[in-house]
Swiss-Prot record:
GO annotation (BP), single: negative regulation of ossification
Keywords assigned by UniProt, alphabetized: Cleavage on pair of basic residues, Cytokine, Disulfide bond, Glycoprotein, Growth factor, Osteogenesis, Secreted, Signal
Protein name per Swiss-Prot or TrEMBL: Growth/differentiation factor 10
Positions of the propeptide segment: 34-368
Native species: Homo sapiens (Human)
Disulfide links within the chain: C376-C443, C405-C475, C409-C477
Amino acid sequence: MAHVPARTSPGPGPQLLLLLLPLFLLLLRDVAGSHRAPAWSALPAAADGLQGDRDLQRHPGDAAATLGPSAQDMVAVHMHRLYEKYSRQGARPGGGNTVRSFRARLEVVDQKAVYFFNLTSMQDSEMILTATFHFYSEPPRWPRALEVLCKPRAKNASGRPLPLGPPTRQHLLFRSLSQNTATQGLLRGAMALAPPPRGLWQAKDISPIVKAARRDGELLLSAQLDSEERDPGVPRPSPYAPYILVYANDLAISEPNSVAVTLQRYDPFPAGDPEPRAAPNNSADPRVRRAAQATGPLQDNELPGLDERPPRAHAQHFHKHQLWPSPFRALKPRPGRKDRRKKGQEVFMAASQVLDFDEKTMQKARRKQWDEPRVCSRRYLKVDFADIGWNEWIISPKSFDAYYCAGACEFPMPKIVRPSNHATIQSIVRAVGIIPGIPEPCCVPDKMNSLGVLFLDENRNVVLKVYPNMSVDTCACR
C-alpha cells in the first residue's frame, strides 16, 4: 500500500507579505525615530544622558531625584557656543551684555515630575530683555503606524471603526513660588505643545513669565510637562534636563571697578589682624604711619619716596601682620677654617654664575627697552586669570591680551600720539617753563575693546558677560 504524505496547511501567500511589508517598514522607522538623539543644531547629543531617567524609574518615590551630569552639561555646551559666537562676531548677546543660565532640579510632586529653577542670582541692575525655556521634547508613546495596528479604536453604530483623532498634545505649565511657602505657587503660564515625530530640543519664549515673577519677588519657578498619554502615577521625565536662559542688560557693568565687583570672589590681601582695618594715620606706631603714606603715591601718580626703615624692619613689620613668612633664615653654626677653605671656591663659582645670570637678564631687559619706542604707544600685556586667582570660576578665556599704554608725551608731540587740544597746550606751557611744576601730558588708552567672559556665579550657574574697556586698541596723549 502506497504511503500518502500528509497535506500541510498552506503558509501566507506572497501577496499578503507584500501588502504588510510597507506597513512594517513604516513602523520600524517610527520606532527608531522615537529613540533618536536630540536633533537641535545648537546642542550635540549626549551618549549617556538617560542615566538620570533610569535612576528615577528605578526609584520613583524619591522626592529629590536629579538627572545625571551629562544631562546638565547641555547648559554648559549651549553657553560655550554663545560665548564663541559673540566673541567671534563682536556683537552684544540679545542686544544686552549678560546671559544667565539656570539649571533645573527635578523633584517628584504628587507623582508628577516637576522641574524647579532658582533665579535669585539675577542682579537688580540687570534689566531682563528676553527669557527662553529650553527643553527636550519626546515623541508620543504610540507612533501613528503603531497606533493604527495596536491601539483599540472606537466604533460607530454600524460597527465600523471611527477615524483616529489628532495626536495627543502636551501641556507645559509654569508656576512661581515665594521663598516662604512650600506650595506649588501661582500659575504664571500654560502652553500647549504638539509632540514631534522624533525627540528634539525646543525653545519657548517665557519673557512675560520671568518678568512678572521678578516684579512680584517670586524668583523660584517650576515647570511641568504633562501629556495625556502618560500613565497616571508613573512619572516619566525627559531624559535631558531643561534649562532657562535670561538675556539681560546690566546697567552697572559700565560703572568703575565693575569687573572686580562681579568676578572677584575674595579680597586678594585679606587682613587677619583687625589692626590694618583701623585708620593708619591715627596709629601710634610710626612704622604704620609711614606704611600708610607709602600707599599715597599709587593714587596721585607721584613717584613714591624712600622708606627710611631698614630691610629687617620691613620684614618684621610684614611678618607681624602675617602677609608672608619671614625671608630671613635661621643662622647656621660658623664652619671651621678648613671648611671655609674647601667651600671658598664653590661659593665663588656659585656667585659668579648668579652675577652672570643677572647681567644677562639686565642686558636683555635693556635691549628690549631700547627696541620699544620711547614715544607714547601701546605695549604688550597678557593677563592670565590664574595669576590673579580667578581661574577657579572663570571658564573662558583662560587669558587675554590686555595691552597697556606707556611712553613720553614731550613737546613737540607727533600726530601719531593723537594729542588732544588740551594736551597740546599743556605740553607747550611745560616746554616754555613760565609756570613751574606743570607735568607733561599722560599716555593713556584712547580706544578700547570689550571682552566676553564665561564664568560661574555664586550658585554655580554659567554666566556670560561682555565687559567694556578690557583691552587697549590705541593710545594717545591726554
